[in-house]
């Protein structure tokens, strides 16, 4: 793949002004990866999102609920960065998998080893009553194969919609990927937000981060 030079990289989906025909074979390509590329991608996306909240006075004093956070190596560096700026943030990291030990013993970080469902979200809402919640979701179930199936994706999106509806966060950053054309099952709803492109994404990627900078009732 040839590099493309531009004055400013595309940041959002609606900035893309061209298109390619879908070719199922492109998903079989194995692009070269940097060491820890996945964690670096998350670091860049979440630093952008949280910095914007900080500039608008939303971040200080908030509770960040991060669902699907493991291993979360990059979160330690996000936490240290905003702590050095004097911001008071409580982090609640939730995943059924184990987190990186680098996150152990941090007084402002709570690690919860659990897969999330609607009933747990309702319990969490009661525990965080009157807290200013910022929601980050990187839920990604996979029932076999190298990539999540369309049914996995739809289940994840339904759960994310439930999280936003119940927690009523001041802002949200939600992961989602549009099913490929030959894997489409049915139409679905996602919250209306700013559809940000992800760093290092291959040309066939249909994955974005949906950033919502408002606590107003969601629009699907």
Curated annotation (Swiss-Prot):
Broadest EC class assigned to this enzyme: transferase
Residue numbers binding S-adenosyl-L-methionine: 39, 66, 68, 72, 95, 97, 116, 138
EC number of the protein: 2.1.1.57
Function: Displays methyltransferase, positive regulation of the poly(A) polymerase and transcription elongation activities. Involved in the modification of both mRNA ends and in intermediate and late gene positive transcription elongation. At the mRNAs 5' end, methylates the ribose 2' OH group of the first transcribed nucleotide, thereby producing a 2'-O-methylpurine cap. At the 3' end, functions as a processivity factor which stimulates the activity of the viral poly(A) polymerase OPG063 that creates mRNA's poly(A) tail.
Gene3D superfamilies, alphabetized: Vaccinia Virus protein VP39 (3.40.50.150)
Cellular location(s): Virion
Family: Belongs to the class I-like SAM-binding methyltransferase superfamily. Poxvirus/kinetoplastid 2'-O-MTase family.
Domain of life, source organism: Viruses
PROSITE patterns recorded: SAM_MT_2O_PK (PS51612)
Molecular function GO terms recorded: mRNA (nucleoside-2'-O-)-methyltransferase activity
Catalytic activity: a 5'-end (N(7)-methyl 5'-triphosphoguanosine)-ribonucleoside in mRNA + S-adenosyl-L-methionine = a 5'-end (N(7)-methyl 5'-triphosphoguanosine)-(2'-O-methyl-ribonucleoside) in mRNA + S-adenosyl-L-homocysteine + H(+)
SUPFAM superfamilies: S-adenosyl-L-methionine-dependent methyltransferases
Pfam family, one: PARP_regulatory
Catalytic site positions: 175
GO CC, alphabetical: virion component
InterPro entries named among the record's database cross-references: mRNA_MeTrfase-like, Pox/kineto_cap_MeTfrase, Poxvir_cap_MeTfrase, SAM-dependent_MTases_sf
Binding partners and assembly: Interacts with poly(A) polymerase catalytic subunit OPG063. Interacts with OPG109 and OPG123; these interactions might help linking transcription to capping and polyadenylation.
GO biological process, one term: methylation
Keywords of the record: Elongation factor, Methyltransferase, mRNA capping, mRNA processing, Protein biosynthesis, S-adenosyl-L-methionine, Transcription, Transferase, Virion
Binding site for mRNA: 22, 177-180, 182, 205-207
Listed name of the protein: Cap-specific mRNA (nucleoside-2'-O-)-methyltransferase
